[in-house]
Amino acid sequence: MSSAVPLNVGITRSADSGASRADGEKRVLLAEPRGYCAGVDRAVETVEKALEKHGAPIYVRKEIVHNRHVVDTLTDQGVVFVDETDEVPEGALLVFSAHGVSPAVHESAAARNLRTIDATCPLVTKVHQEAKRFARDDFDILLIGHEGHEEVEGTAGEAPDHVQLVDGPDSVDAVTVRDESKVIWLSQTTLSVDETMQTVARLRERFPNLQDPPSDDICYATQNRQVAVKAMAPECDLVIVVGSRNSSNSVRLVEVALNAGAKASYLVDYAREVDPAWLDGVRTVGITSGASVPEILVRGVIDLLDEHGFHDVQPVTTANETLVFALPRELRAART
């Protein structure tokens, strides 16, 4: 599934590498697309509309999205973030985060008579449905993802007797299956495409009949942001990724930048976290942001770089995203 239209990259390349621009103008390469994806936009708006409709406090299980600024802003507005449903007063309103939850969490909420709104990204829900479908057909499901991530816990919880977590290529040797003719891989939606394909290749060496998911599990936005970073990284002395450390897709962007040729790459939540020493001798800085990052945080980094002489900002556009997800049915009438 994709909402992306391929576009020209449009980087004005130097004759040599970015480092050879020492006598030229400092510049910023600004990745497009970046920032909010459709699932994050839907999740954040779900909480905002729930506040408007029901008033504070409302409760959210885990972080609605993995971004410190978003969570802090919503907390200031009266949202209470909890780890588990037993922390929510009986009968209160609880929103499930964009990362999805297992059936056991739904059951726990119902047992406490909680009113619930599900802000799970529809692309995560798709993976849940795949897990249920292949479990019904008695497949061994190899779920590629990061141990402890909420999305992985939710997906695995749909079919705990059939799902095995595969946390990267190094985990492949420990995988065991019952019937090598009935094995399928699924994945967390926010992984590095390249590393996931490495893991799949290793799995296929062990299990030649390994089936692919019916459609891409890594979401369009994750892929698009990685493609944009790959396009600009070879020209960059430095790539700054705006995002939080618990954001899987943001962390992956740092890895992608380094693997694609950037000389250095750092993850920051705010412009104030940019170390001026990072800019010593730098002529080309790439900027991108994770899928849960509001644009105001990117603008803060651009303004900071402008103060350090990086006045020339060139967009690097590799796709145009148009996808919009409907709000949960409880709130659709409230959307403007």
From Swiss-Prot:
Q: Recorded E.C. number(s)?
A: 1.17.7.4
The residues that hold (2E)-4-hydroxy-3-methylbut-2-enyl diphosphate are 66, 99, 149, 189, 247-249, 292
* Single biological process term from Gene Ontology: dimethylallyl diphosphate biosynthetic process
Molecular function terms from GO: 4 iron, 4 sulfur cluster binding; 4-hydroxy-3-methylbut-2-enyl diphosphate reductase activity; metal ion binding
Q: Which residues bind isopentenyl diphosphate?
A: 66, 99, 149, 247-249, 292
* UniProt KW Cell cycle keyword: no
Catalytic activity reported: isopentenyl diphosphate + 2 oxidized [2Fe-2S]-[ferredoxin] + H2O = (2E)-4-hydroxy-3-methylbut-2-enyl diphosphate + 2 reduced [2Fe-2S]-[ferredoxin] + 2 H(+); dimethylallyl diphosphate + 2 oxidized [2Fe-2S]-[ferredoxin] + H2O = (2E)-4-hydroxy-3-methylbut-2-enyl diphosphate + 2 reduced [2Fe-2S]-[ferredoxin] + 2 H(+)
The record lists [4Fe-4S] cluster as bound by 37, 121, 219
Role this protein plays? Catalyzes the conversion of 1-hydroxy-2-methyl-2-(E)-butenyl 4-diphosphate (HMBPP) into a mixture of isopentenyl diphosphate (IPP) and dimethylallyl diphosphate (DMAPP). Acts in the terminal step of the DOXP/MEP pathway for isoprenoid precursor biosynthesis.
Alphabetical list of HAMAP family matching this protein = IspH
Give the similarity note: Belongs to the IspH family.
Protein name from the UniProt record: 4-hydroxy-3-methylbut-2-enyl diphosphate reductase
Q: What species is this protein from?
A: Rhodococcus jostii (strain RHA1)
